[in-house]
Structure formats: C-alpha cells, structure tokens
Amino acid sequence: MHTRMQIRNRVNFGKITDLNLLPNLIYVQKKSFDWFLQSEVKDPTKRLNQGLEAVFRESFPIESPNNDMVMEYGHYVLGEPKRDPQECKDTDSSFAVPLKAVIRLIIKDTGEIREQVVYMGDLPVMTDHGTFIINGAERVVVSQLHRSPGIFFSYDQVRDTFSARVIPYRGSWLEFEMDNKGILVAKIDRKKKFPATLLVKAMGMGTNEEVLRLFYGSSKMKIAGANPKDLKRLIGRRTIADIINMETGEVMLDAGSKINEDNISILREMKVKEVDVIEFPKGKDNPVLINCLEKDGVNDYEDAVKKFHTIMRPGEPSTIENAEAELKRLFFSPKTFDLGIVGRYKINSKFEFNNPKEFSKADDRVLRKQDIIETVRYLVMLMSEAENYYPDDIDHLGNRRIRSVGELIANQLKLGFSRVERVIKERMTVQEPEQQTPQLLISIKPITAVINEFFGSSQLSQFMDQTNPLAELTHKRRLNALGPGGLSRDRAGFEVRDVHYSHYGRMCPIETPEGPNIGLILSMSSFARVNDYGFIETPYRLVKNGKVQKQVEYLTADKEEYHYMAQSNSTVDEKGEFTSKLISTRHRGDFPFRSPAEIQYMDLAPLQVVSVSTALIPFLEHDDANRALMGSNMQRQAVPLLTEEAPFVGTGMEARAAYDAGVCIVAKKDGVVSKVDATGVWIKEDQSKEIVHYPLIKFKKTNQGTCFNQKPNVSMLHTTTGGKVSKVSKERVEVTTPNGEKETHELLLSDEVQFHAVVKEGQEVGIGAPVAGQIIKGEKYGDFGQILQKGTVLANGPSTDAGYLALGRNVLVAFMPWEGYNFEDAILISERIIKDDVFSSIHIEEFEIQARETKLGQEQITRDIPNLSDKAFRDLDESGVIRVGAEVKPGDILVGMVTPKGETDLTPEYKLLHSIFGEKAKEVRDSSLRMPNGFEGTVIDIKRYSRETGDELAAGVEEMVKVYVARKRKLLVGDKMAGRHGNKGVVARVMAQEDMPYMEDGSPVDIVLNPLGVPSRMNLGQIFETQLGFAAKKLGINFETPVFDGASEGDVNDFCKKAGLPENSKFQLYDGRTGEKFINQVFCGYIYMLKLAHLVDDKIHARSTGPYSLVTQQPLGGKAQFGGQRLGEMEVWALEAYGASHTLQELLTIKSDDMLGRARIYEAIVKGIHSIKPGIPESFNVLVQELRGLALDIIIKDSEGLEVDISDYEDEFSKNKKKIKFETIENV
C-alpha cells in the first residue's frame, strides 16, 4: 500500500457545527473581480452596467468642444493572457489580458461613422486563487472597510447638539448642525454656513408658512366664543401662518410667532374666529426652525435661490438661471454628484422611501429635494426627542461597507478615463475632422499609469503573505480600514478600533494586529459574506412560531437590529422546538431572555463569530482573548516543515482551510487514478474516459522565501510478486502468484479512501504492476461558492497533511522548570528534534543578474574572469553559470560576468594584442554575481533568459540569469517557537536526548516548557490540548474539538481513561542525567508546536569591515547594510561611569568616524607600532558645517588661541594632539 495512506480515525466533539454550510473562503475576492470583469457573459451587449462596463459607459460618449463630432463606446473585448501564472512568475512579468474596446467616431456634418477596435492597455487579471501577479510577484488586493455613503445623524455629547451629514460616493458633502445661537445651519463642503431653511426654500418651499407646514403638524384653536380656560391654553402657542388684517393688509402676527394676551385681544378685536397653531412633537416648544426663518431673510423661492448663489459664489452675478444651475451642479447633476447605488439604498431604507409612484426609481443616484427635506425633518424630530428617532452609530456595521477588489479597480480606472477624456477633447480641437480616427484620438497612457500605480504602489495592493497556506488565505479575507478614502492611523480613536456588537458573525473580534494598526486591520468571520451593496452578511436559521426551520437567511447588521437572535447552543428537540421556556438571546447590544415565540432567528454555528485563523485554535473558550489574538497571528507565521503532520487535537476547520487556500491540487471531475509519480497525477475521468494530467509544483520559492512543494496524496495498489488475477470484486482483488500463493488487495479502506480495480480476472500481471486505482471525486460548487461536493485532494501543498492543514508538529511536552533554561518563556528541546528533522524547514533564495548593454560595450556572462584562482571556478560551467547541486557559501561566484572598463588611447603594442586575441585583451572589470553574506545552501535551479533565444526582457537587458539556492534549516538556539494559544518562546538550549527528563517507560520528553507561563497568561487551552493530545497518541486517533462547541473537561477525562492515562495527566518523571525521580509528578502530554518565521539565522549578525556613511563616515546600521552595532549615549555613560577614557576615545574616533585615525591604525598594525594618536572625528566636521549652515561663522582655535584649519590638522601625521575650542563671531 502507498506510504501516504496512513488513515487515522477522527473523533469530532461538535454537536452543532456544520462546515458544509461554509461559503468558499476566498469567494469575496473572486466574486468581486467577476462582478468587475463580467467575463462569463458571452454576449457583450448583455453586460450589466457595473464594474468595467460602467466605467466605459460613464466616460462615453465624448463630444468635441465645438460639437462637430462625437465619440461613442460599443463594447469591450478581453484577449487571452500571453503566459500562464507560473511563467509570469519565472519571467518577472504580469499576468494580464489585453483590453480592447469597439469605439465609434461620428462626424456630425456628414453623418460618417468611423469604427475601430482600440487597444486600451493590459489589464491584470485574477488567478484561480484570488491573487494577481504583477512583475513576477504574487499580490493581493485587500478589501477596504469605509464609511458607507448615505445620510447620518450624530449626537455631540460635549455641545449637547445633533447634526446630520449627507455623504455621497462622489461629490459635495452637505452638513446640518446647530450653531451657538440655536440656529440650524447648513454647510456645503465645510465652507460658509447659512440657515438650513434657506436651502429648504430654494427647494421650492418659498414662504415661511410652507416651510412650517412641511415640518410640523397644525391644529385649529377657536377664539370667537371660547371660554377663558381655552384662551389661556392659547397663550405661548405659535401660529403656523401669517395672521393678516383683512382691511388694512397688515401682518398682525408672523408665522411662528408666540401668542400672548395682547395678541389675543387684538385678534378678538379683528373678529378672528380661529387660529392655526403649530403642533410640536411631544408638545414641547422647539423654536429651532423659527429662529432659522427669522435669520434667512427671504420669503419666496427666487430670493432664496439667489441668496444661496450669493453665499456659494460671492462676487458672481446672481441671476435666477445662474443660481438654479449652481444648485443643480452641487446636488442634482449625475456628473458632479453621485450617491452610488449604496447611498440611494441607505437613504431609501432610512426614510422608508419605498413607494415607486411618489419617487423616481430606486437607483436614482443624485440627491432629491425630498431627501433634503426629510433630513431636516429627522433632525427636528431628534431635537424634539420624538419616539423612534435615534442618532446613528457611525461604528455600526450598517454604516460601514466593504470596497472589494473589483470596485477599487473600477474607481482607479474612472480616474484614468477622466484624464483620457481631457486628452481626446484637446486632440479633437487640434486636428482636422477628416484625418481623425478613434485610434489617433485615444491615448492609453493615463489608463496604464493608473493601473500600474494601483497594483504597484497602492496601500491596498499588498505583497502576498505566503509564509504558509493559512497566511495566504487570511490575507485574502483581510479587511483594511486604512488606505485612500479610509481612516488614518494617527486620527483613528478608540471607538472605531473597538469591538462592536454589530461585528458578531461578520468581523472577527479576536484576529487583529498588535501595535498601531490594532482594530483597523480586521479579518472576516468564517461564515460571513459580502452582499451586492458591500455590506457584510452573516447566516441565521429562521425561527417561525418558536420552531427552528432548516431555512438559512443571511442578514446585514442593520436588518439584524430589529430581531431577537437565539444562540446556536440553545437546546432544540427533534421537531425544532426550544426545550426551555426562556431563551438567552441577543438584541442590539443586550442579552435579554425571551420566550420562543418572540425569537425570529437563531445562530447557525458557534464558529460564525470568529475568523478562520481563530477557528483553528482548539479549546479557544478556555483562552484569554489577548493570548488568542497572539495565537491567531502566530499561526500565520509558522514555517512549512520538511515533514508535515496534522495536529492530534484540531478543530475540524483544518481540512477546509487547506482546501480553500488553494495550495493543494483538487480533482475537477470524478474518475480513477491511472498513474502517480513525483511530478504529477493522472486521472481517468468517468464521463469523458480521457486521462487528465495534474502536474505538481516542485520546490518553488514563495514570496517569503519558504518552500512551495506538492506531494501526491492519492495512490495505486501494486502487486509485489506478479502472477494471475484470480478474483476481482468491489471489495478486493486477488492475485495468484506463480508458486500458488494468494496476494489480496483490499479496495474499501475507509469511507474516504476506496479503490477501483484496473485489471480483469485471468489477466497476467508482472511484478510491481498496478491492480487498482484510487476512486476520485470531483469538486462541485453552489451559487454562493458553498461546496456541494468536496473534490478529492490529489496532492498536498506546503503545510498540509492528507488534505489537512499541518502548520507544526505534535511533540511530547513536560511542563516543569529545568535549571532556569526555560525561565521567562524560554524553551528547552531534545536533540532528537534536530536529529530527526522534526522542525527542519527548507528555505529558498533567488539571486538574479542581468547583462546589460553599456556605453562602453556589452556586459558578458562568462567563465573568463580576470585575477581569480581556479578554485573560484570549480563549480561554474563553460558559460560561467554555477551547476545545479553545487554547495555555495558567502562570496562564492554564482554567475561570472565582466563589464567593459573605460579605455584611454591604446598603444600600438596593445592594438596588436587586441587584433590577435580579440576581446580578451580589452580592459574588463569583474561584476560577477556572488553569494551574499549570511547565505549558504545548495543550488537547486537555474533559469536563463536571453534576447537571442527570443525571450522578452526589459529595455537594455541582453541576458538574465536566476539562481535558486535552497537551504535546510534545523531548529537552533534562538529560534522562535509557539503553540496555538499565544504561548510563544525562544529555544534556549538543545539537550542531549539521554539527558532529557524521561517517563517511566523510558521515553524522553521532546520539549520542556515553564509551567509559570500558564496561570498569569490565562491560556488554559494548551493544558486541555496537551492532555487530549496524549490520549490521541495512545489511541491512534485524531480529535476535532470545534470552538465553543468542543470537548468538555469530562470528555477529555473519559478519553484519558480509555487510553489508560491518569485523569490529571501527571506522570512520574526521572532526571535523564542522574536517573533520579523528580520530587513531584509532572504534567505531560502531546502539544502542537509551530516553528515561526523569526529564525535566528536571519537576525544574528556581526560586522568585520564594511561600508561607511558618506556624510558622517560612521559605519552603517542594520544587517542588510552589513552595519555595525550602535554605541549610543547610554553606552557612553556606562563607559564614563567606569572611567574607561581610552576605550571610550578609541570607540568614538578610530573605531567610528576618524578617517585619518583609521588609516593610521591600519599602518600601525602593519608596522607593529603601538602608540595611536586619535584625530578629529568626521562628525565634528559635520557639526561645524551644520553650524555654518545656520549662518554662524565657526573659527577653530588651539590651546594657544591660534586659528586651526582642520584640513591642515589632518595632514600633520606625527604632531602632538592639540586642544581645540570653537568660538562664534559673537563671542570673539
């Protein structure tokens, strides 16, 4: 049987979690790019107005300034990519398709139509795994979390005022707020303020009465014949309309005026029978709008519009046409103001605009007059504390939406197309109409520029984290609140970073970086998906009349507000009815108890709260949130190991995470394995009967320098002896050997692993011939990316074991202090771990050299390098490139190359040599590619590209060679390790296996951790994992304990009993050095440990002689620059305190930046002189020049008061040291 087929039984403790309902975990990326490109739509005329199509439609038609021609858009056409993704990586090119568009130019005078297919540039396209390849590097466009367009109402606690903001997708912001005088004012783009009623009147409500009737109710109160009590009630009320004396035409009371006793008397005298008064909400007098009406000073529509124009455009003539045009430009023109579909949806849902007769269509993307009026009305109601009117919570997920990759690219292209439009209009005016064609008018430079800028340098287009499959998957599911149009790190306060109740099931409350980005970079929860409007939805089971239905509904955060949600672990009987009379529910930010009849929805799974990374932590419920955060983040840093091993204690999420990460090869269709080797898997498909080849990726470098390698996960059954097939059934194949013995091959190994016979009864088979191939299932997906049938994993990728995510290894751990070697999270490990390559990993580095055409001639890749010994060439081939398999160390030549030197006039003798020997006699300089410091390993691959062989290379490059060097890294002292619970530490000592503490059966432990790392960190999950891990090892099974739905303490104890282990998992250990018992029993078991990408080899560094800074002449800093260690002010204090004056002087001068002193010390070492006189440090000269830059004339004098020229001073080699003081002009 094939060695990969190690089938371990799995025990899942989950009672609720159904992972089949999980959507495809990278569906967010794929769906968004499909929305943008619409490549599935075969007929271009049937494309929807979205994404790329919308960009074209918004930009065209383009009319010439003098109206003599117009350019129209037909449709766009996508070509085929030139190379496949792997080729693009190898050749440093982008995985892109040519974008062409059918453009028509119509000459209006003649009616002539000139149609052309115009090339619009190369558009990068997404790979099957949701990534882009730009210049050979795999990149991810991260989804952005930004404030949704719409209308928002907020409350300022300090000023005790309400305000409203209309935020469009594109265009001017409109704000309403209270000023200090109690007047409701409006602001456009945070400029000049004006009374809000002025804007309302400019909408067509001209008079004060019309405005008041618009926002308030009214009631009639009798005056004629009213009794004194009723008249008293009238005092203090406000009129809704002007009260006019009919005889004189005089306004007795303005609309909004308060009625007092004198007014009543006058009204009675005028024989007014009844008065229309304002009915304020809740009966409270709130004169906010009346104050505005007094302030705005206009009483009809025309005056209002003109005054508005004067405020917005002071100095310009205010005619009614100008004023109306300005108002239209600001809010009612699709060219300058766009709410977006989302903004319109938010406004319609806020003000319940769902009546199609009353309003125009719902996708009307400009502002409507009714929107402004309703905004003011809502604000007035908020100020009056009316019922069911609340300010918005800006941190609520109903008010924040996701801008995914498709939308981000579309926004960038809009920018490019607007620049193209300007160029087209300019060219239309310059050239004659007869000569013009679409191709000549369109310049694609702005489009390619914005595409390159976005993918190359945008904050949201990121170099993919490819350390392991989980890092890759999480990067694609990341949400970023930063970036253009988002928040900034410095201005983001605590509230926006904090966990909000609306994040439940949508964004993970655990996974976020530590440091300045905390709470701004988040991860989507495992079941979450993004709807068409960009809002995150999470699934719930519907509850009808207290019965839980099978139907699943996805809800956004704002829709969830109105419902009571039961938790997924609420007990339900077979009929779907709740067993308790009171159920714990969630409603907004509270957790009230409700009867089953009041519940509308129930959580789908406990897992839906957390992200994929957090869902991989077993016993998460026993860990403190801070440590769980570290555990989630550190799993992404785990280095893929040489031999992968799935955890004994997992969560059930491992298979799905590995499957969706895209590192495994998955069967597309049903079939049977017909051949397997190290390079690929061949499947005979059931339907087509064709044999399909799935090639494997072998030893490729990832973005982070880890090793990407795929190994077969399926197999065939082979005979060991050969003979005649005597029996073939569904269950087994029997082969009778020549000497009459029977060889039986079982075909049904488990539910997942089954074989199909590929031989017939009576057939003769040779030794090692295949008799059965594994049965393969093809993958099938639903509409929303959910898996209907999981495809068989044909090959494991990095960090995967039999299709399960395997980031680390299971090791035998003892929690005990050991002579201080595990003090403060340090880790003591056994030498067995290094001997057996338990935590060894392969790392691959790429080195590249380019031979260019220079002014002095062409650079040559050659073995013919001047002034080098034969030893340097020992591994180079005849063309000067190192052989595959060569062991290389720092300084070794990887590729030999020479560059021509500048030549002076040649002597006749030299010319003769040159003519005889050709190029060899020319002056050349060695510019070979050498192994840099700190790197060593084995050359595993060479890639050569040359113009001569037809390869496409960058301008000026004639030849390019890439050398790939692999290195096996064993676990070393100083390497960082961690568990899944935030329990991290550094390897402090490697102990001989025989000296490690050992158990009663003689088996030594692999790793010793400090027990003091557990109580204060409160990550008890590691204790449960260790205990259950030992039971798994003993019983030969793997456990799955889903988060918040996993094994209880009782379950763990039961399995320990079954495995014959003590319930407390404490054992008597013996000291490996003495053989004596330890005094107390020690807690032992199997824990899953990871080796993180913080390896000591990448960090440790020592400088011998290296580069110096040009200005200060001090050694550079950092490992990359081969720099030195900084001697800072604290170190200087320490030496001063110690009185080590000579040591200090030496460190500050000749060992740092005293150039003359450096030369002297070298000479002294050569000549054997021991007395060294330090000179002036270069930083002193820099200081003098800095002071001169401040216009201070610095004069340097010696102890005798004579002026010293620093340059002269440096020339004097043997003079005694001079005491120097420096003075400025002021104190001379």
Swiss-Prot record:
Gene3D superfamilies xref list: 2.40.50.100, 2.40.50.150, 3.90.1100.10, DNA-directed RNA polymerase, subunit 2, domain 6 (2.40.270.10), RNA polymerase alpha subunit dimerisation domain (3.90.1800.10), RNA polymerase Rpb2, domain 2 (3.90.1110.10)
Quaternary structure, per UniProt, is: The RNAP catalytic core consists of 2 alpha, 1 beta, 1 beta' and 1 omega subunit. When a sigma factor is associated with the core the holoenzyme is formed, which can initiate transcription.
Gene Ontology terms: cellular component: DNA-directed RNA polymerase complex
User: Which CDD domains does UniProt cross-reference here?
Assistant: RNA_pol_B_RPB2
The record's section on SUPFAM superfamilies has:
beta and beta-prime subunits of DNA dependent RNA-polymerase
Top-level EC class: transferase
Q: Which family does it belong to?
A: Belongs to the RNA polymerase beta chain family.
Q: Supply the name of the protein.
A: DNA-directed RNA polymerase subunit beta
Q: Which reaction does it catalyse?
A: RNA(n) + a ribonucleoside 5'-triphosphate = RNA(n+1) + diphosphate
Report the GO molecular function annotations: DNA binding; DNA-directed RNA polymerase activity; ribonucleoside binding
Q: What is its EC number?
A: 2.7.7.6
Which keywords accompany this UniProt record?
DNA-directed RNA polymerase, Nucleotidyltransferase, Transcription, Transferase
The protein's job, in short, is: DNA-dependent RNA polymerase catalyzes the transcription of DNA into RNA using the four ribonucleoside triphosphates as substrates.
PANTHER family tied to this protein: DNA-DIRECTED RNA POLYMERASE I SUBUNIT 2
InterPro entries (UniProt xref): DNA-dir_RNA_pol_bsu_external_1, DNA-dir_RNA_pol_su2, DNA-dir_RNAP_su2_dom, DNA-dir_RNAP_su2_hyb_sf, RNA_pol_bsu_bac, RNA_pol_bsu_CS, RNA_pol_bsu_protrusion, RNA_pol_Rpb2_2
Q: What species was this sequence derived from?
A: Leptospira biflexa serovar Patoc (strain Patoc 1 / ATCC 23582 / Paris)
Output the GO biological process annotations, alphabetical, semicolon-separated. Answer: DNA-templated transcription
